[in-house]
Amino acid sequence: MLSAALRLTAKRNVRSLATASSSSYPGALLNVPKTQVTRLPNGLTVATESNPALATATVGVWIDSGSRAETKANNGVAHFLEHISFKGTKQRTQSGLEIEIENMGGHLNAYTSREQTVYYAKLFSQDVAKGVNILGDILQNSTLDPGAIDRERAVILREAEEVDKQVEEVVFDHLHAAAFPENALGYTILGPKENIQTLSQADLQAYIKNNYTADRMVVVGAGNVDHAELCKLAETNFGKLPQGSGKAKFVRPAFTGSDVRIRVDDMPTAHIALAVEGASWTSADHWPLLVASAMIGSYDRAAGNAHPSSKLAQIVAKHNLANSFTSFNTTYSDTGLWGIYIQSNNRDNLDDLAHFTVREWMRLATAPSEGEVAIAKQQLKTSLLLALDGTTPVAEEIGRQMLAYGRRLSPFEIDRLVDAVTVEDVKRVANEFIYDRDLAIVAVGPVECLPDYNRIRSAMNLLRY
């Protein structure tokens, strides 16, 4: 429970924030440029947020397909394709493509996630037409040269080695595999080494045919980009894309309570992730779970925050239980993961760390306070708005939301959705998703003192603990 002083401070802060919200703050959100959306005859969607005052723009293609659209046999093909797409097209050699981008002063990039693949360019507004042409070319006309494919294997294998050195990446890959076994959502994005060594031109071509269709793509523009002009460019450069069979259909994965531990006693830091099943993008519980995650908050000893706002952060700081922790709410089209990622050098007190973490989770279901919820909502709204600083983050949000919701949620609408979350909403979702629910545990490093699965699981019910 918050101390009396903290409760008083919270109430004062909430009153002052409410006063600010009632005047200029909502008005500023309403002044954000409207997102314009057009669907072309072949099913391709074009979405833009135009700001003519800027000199730059981000244009990109968001594709409703990632590693979740793969099988065990071709796991890694989406990421492999992202690499090989930049190795030359029927019109442009690899060096010609690189020189063209360099001469514009632009940046061409791509990334693959579990449910989406993204190709985008950051450039001056006068080069938007060139950027869209390049994106259309690499997505539809890549040569997929067998020699380039073989050369790229070594690059991706080195990338996989680097990923394996990043413990956080390893933990979250294991977390997905443990929580969603025998489902493509549990696959890694890079795929196993065996697949990287054997994926062929035919595998890449089949993936393109099945997934790179107009109805699964959104062409996005943010910054100094004209919507009508981008629609014309999309029609010219993507108008011949086949329509496809509609949105990808996945089997909803069954969340599995599980425990994966990789004990390495000579590592200095224990890395631990605890997660329960979360909600999908479109679930009404998505926003209360985000607020609940913000209430658990984050902590970093190196940041030197003497007065952390979350109760768990206060406990961890007081007893030196962890170097850092971050609560997370990872969302997918039909499920999610809600949990916490912790790093700790205090290997002998991991039992206390697990105890206080789960205790705070249980408190969300039994006794969250008005002050805590109000502060968490303000922090969440701030973080969501600060994440939109620049044309590329705006483009990413537009693309992600168009694929997830079929529309863009404006900053004002998101602000209202967060604001509408009540203490009772937090208690309800905590009881539904967290209290007495199975959880997935992944721990890497010196984790001998972390309690076993059954002990942590029993603490998820206050009557049994």
UniProtKB/Swiss-Prot annotation:
Single GO term (MF): metalloendopeptidase activity
Species annotation: Blastocladiella emersonii (Aquatic fungus)
Ways its activity is controlled: Binding to the alpha subunit is required for catalytic activity.
Main localization category: mitochondrion
Protein's UniProt name: Mitochondrial-processing peptidase subunit beta
Top-level EC class as recorded in UniProt: hydrolase
EC numbers: 3.4.24.64
Entries under SUPFAM superfamilies matching the protein: LuxS/MPP-like metallohydrolase
Active site per the UniProt annotation: E82
Gene Ontology CC: mitochondrial matrix
Catalyses which reaction(s): Release of N-terminal transit peptides from precursor proteins imported into the mitochondrion, typically with Arg in position P2
One Pfam family named in its UniProt record: Peptidase_M16_C
